[in-house]
């Protein structure tokens, strides 16, 4: 009896430590965005160079996730968790102490290699140690922390920057947390790993890393404002084609490794599993839903008229709702199973995102819509997809979870570029919309000449120019035209997110319906 209580207490400690680790790692990619301008000025680099602080972290996460998942299955999840936290802490220290921008970028890469696997290790540990009826809630808790940290990162970064006056503290704050995680993790986390350990698939790791880096780098060079034109950029299509060829070579190689009885980094039999394939598709779509959240601050600023300094705070209702949704999704997965949970997630998120173009005109309406959307996609953040891939993977849970996380990251990288195209299209309509409204109202050519130059720039700068127009009627007509054009761009964006939610429902329900029919 006492042994059972001790084990239960140890499991609670382990889950708490994994939760803190997940929050710390997920927070770091968003927290830097608040200080990006300050960091660029500190190192005297351009914004385009400065953005590499985020891009390199994203690339590092993408590469490390599937590899760490496999290594944790092989060498032990506790051991890899402690190594990952140490790497993340070391990277944070080096970032804070960086005296040059190249060293800053290298340190960010070390951070990413350390933070990338923490969520995967925690999830696979839960799936390996907890009974099935308790896995959902625990995974939901991890998912809640992961989602909330990603959404709240910019706000927390702004607060710390205002409080300390230095961007270095955004990273130094990780050090005491990392030390405590290592100390308590060594004491309370039980070691778990896959039953067999064969020779490490070094060639597979190399091919997988090369494929991920090439595809993700190509995607980061896409331009949402000129999507079709950017696809003709050699840095885009060249990298993506090279990455696809590397992945094809990886599949061929891994098939031979598996046939010879080896231990591939990405099991060929797992990729052929239909449930695993469908779950990866849903994972890709879930990244698309998360990407829609990125545009919330600009939406409330440009459409609802919230000051830029306060726009980020309007992410809070959605962040809290996504955390609640992740927890509810975990509980529902335990009771009703992952398939029904995913279907309900799609229904709620579709309704939430659809409210943006169909209903939202006031701030209180925005809060209701964002809470509904947050609860909906929050369901997908933790339990249901993780349970689905682990059931398909059986023993190689870390590998399966790592692959799922990678695919979600691809969706999260690609979707903002596509969404930005909708916003750009809305801005491009501003000039025509203004001309049309003034002409319909019978204003003269002289009134037309009062219109400021429209170059699809910030709405706030356009509004400043409009305030200088002396004729109130002209001023009102132009303001209404700008508001309508901006609304058009965001309406299409969130309508697309609602469609993505419907695709989630289709991806999980159509195969289930076919199985029942048989």
UniProtKB/Swiss-Prot annotation:
Alphabetic keyword roster: Cell membrane, Membrane, Transmembrane, Transmembrane helix, Transport
A GO BP annotation: transmembrane transport
Organism of derivation: Bacillus subtilis (strain 168)
GO molecular function, a single term: transmembrane transporter activity
Residue spans crossing the bilayer: 13-33, 49-69, 86-106, 109-129, 141-161, 169-189, 202-222, 231-251, 280-300, 312-332, 341-361, 365-385, 410-430, 493-513
GO cellular component: plasma membrane
Gene name, Swiss-Prot/TrEMBL: yfiU
Membrane topology, as annotated: Multi-pass membrane protein
Protein name per Swiss-Prot or TrEMBL: Uncharacterized MFS-type transporter YfiU
Entry's family note: Belongs to the major facilitator superfamily. TCR/Tet family.
Subcellular location: Cell membrane
Pfam families (UniProt xref): MFS_1
Highest taxon above the source species: Bacteria
């Amino acid at each position: 009896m006492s042994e059972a209580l001790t084990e239960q207490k140890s499991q609670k400690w382990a889950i708490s430590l994994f939760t803190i680790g997940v929050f710390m790692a997920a927070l770091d990619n968003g927290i830097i965005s608040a200080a990006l301008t300050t960091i660029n000025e500190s190192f005297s680099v351009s914004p385009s160079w400065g953005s590499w602080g985020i891009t390199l972290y994203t690339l590092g996460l993408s590469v490390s996730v599937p590899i760490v998942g496999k290594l944790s299955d092989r060498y032990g999840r506790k051991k890899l968790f402690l190594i990952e936290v140490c790497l993340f802490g070391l990277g944070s220290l080096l970032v804070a102490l960086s005296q040059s921008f190249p060293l800053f970028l290298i340190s960010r890469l070390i951070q990413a290699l350390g933070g990338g696997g923490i969520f995967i290790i925690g999830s696979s540990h839960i799936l390996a140690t907890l009974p099935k009826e308790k896995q959902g809630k625990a995974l939901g808790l991890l998912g809640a922390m992961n989602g909330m940290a990603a959404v709240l990162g910019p706000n927390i970064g702004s607060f710390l920057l205002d409080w300390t006056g230095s961007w270095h503290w955004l990273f130094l704050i990780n050090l005491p947390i990392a030390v405590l995680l290592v100390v308590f993790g060594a004491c309370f986390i039980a070691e778990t790993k896959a039953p067999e350990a064969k020779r490490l698939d070094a060639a597979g790791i190399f091919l997988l890393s090369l494929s991920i880096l090439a595809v993700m780098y190509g995607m980061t060079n896409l331009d949402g404002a000129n999507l079709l034109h950017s696809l003709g950029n050699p840095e885009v299509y060249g990298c993506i084609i090279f990455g696809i060829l590397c992945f094809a070579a990886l599949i061929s190689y891994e098939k031979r490794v598996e046939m010879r009885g080896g231990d591939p980094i990405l099991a060929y039999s797992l990729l052929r599993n239909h449930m695993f394939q469908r779950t990866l598709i849903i994972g890709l779509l879930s990244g698309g839903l998360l990407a829609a959240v990125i545009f919330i601050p600009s939406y409330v600023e440009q459409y609802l008229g919230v000051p830029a300094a306060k726009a980020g705070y309007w992410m809070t209702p959605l962040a809290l709702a996504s955390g609640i949704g992740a927890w509810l999704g975990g509980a529902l997965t335990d009771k009703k199973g992952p398939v029904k949970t995913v279907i309900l997630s799609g229904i709620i998120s579709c309704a939430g995102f659809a409210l943006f173009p169909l209903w939202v005109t006031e701030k209180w309406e925005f809060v209701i819509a964002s809470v509904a959307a947050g609860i909906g996609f929050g369901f997908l953040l933790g339990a249901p997809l993780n349970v689905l891939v682990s059931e398909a993977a059986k023993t190689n849970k870390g590998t399966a979870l790592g692959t799922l996380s990678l695919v979600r990251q691809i969706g999260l990288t690609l979707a903002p570029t596509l969404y930005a195209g909708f916003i750009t299209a809305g801005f491009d309509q501003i000039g025509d919309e203004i001309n049309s409204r003034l002409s319909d109202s019978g204003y003269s050519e002289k009134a037309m000449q009062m219109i400021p130059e429209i170059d699809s720039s910030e709405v706030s700068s356009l509004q400043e120019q409009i305030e200088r127009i002396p004729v109130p009627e002209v001023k009102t007509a132009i303001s209404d035209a700008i508001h309508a054009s901006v609304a058009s761009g965001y309406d299409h964006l969130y309508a697309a997110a609602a469609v993505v939610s419907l695709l989630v429902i289709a991806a999980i329900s159509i195969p289930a319906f076919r199985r029942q029919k048989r």
